Amino acid sequence: MACVIPAYRAAHTLRAVLEQLRGSLPCAHLIVVDDGSPDDTAALAASLADRCIRLAGNRGKGAALRAGFDEALRSDHDVVLTIDADGQHDPSYAPALIDALEGFDIVIGARLRSGSPMPLRRRMTNAMASMAIARVTGVRLHDTQSGYRAIRRRVLERVRAQGDRYEFETDFLIRAAHAGFRVRNAVVPTVYGTASHFQGMRDSARIVKTIWAHRARSEREVS
């Protein structure tokens, strides 16, 4: 299996994430995609990960995930785990997330708050997105926006999501659900302490736009 870790300005947290992943998933192929970080993120990734991809400029989380997925598909990995590089996700829960794939194609880590609470704007975006995605896809999930995910290879081979920032993960989920892939949540703890690269209203607007585009497309197909 492979782990795809999108990273931006993660020099202070990346080492711990990668070392903990090595302990939790010793056989996993670790792929770090550095999204044009100006700090030592790329140097750390090159020394600690199995593969380091460096994007030209800060293109966004979606662009980093897309590059990581393409890299993972070049080998025979049957499962790909995505985890953020900022330390919000506990790598020790990775095996449980993968085990939860039994009978499913995608498992999304549903965030339990521990330590600092989830920022209010992110909480509101997550709640509204989950409700809207349920209306568009018929799939009801507690948390649709978490970046801690386990994904079967067959999903990545079929689903080509759009967007370069956080809307990529929403678009990916909707396209996968429409393609008939089975999705579920699994509870994972999340710590909010470091600053997020989520750009408030701008990224929230991109997510809403993505959901409404899919809803409009579905309505046209029905009519």
Give the residues covered by each predicted segment.
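Short, well-formed alpha-helical segments that are part of the catalytic scaffolds
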Residues: 9-23
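A conserved acidic beta->alpha catalytic loop
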Residues: 34-42, 87
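Catalytic donor-sugar/metal-binding loop of nucleotide-sugar-dependent glycosyltransferases
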Residues: 140, 164, 174-191
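Cell-envelope/extracellular polymer assembly enzymes that use nucleotide-activated donors
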Residues: 1-2, 29, 171
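Short beta-strand-to-loop acidic/aromatic patch adjacent to the donor-nucleotide binding site
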Residues: 77-86
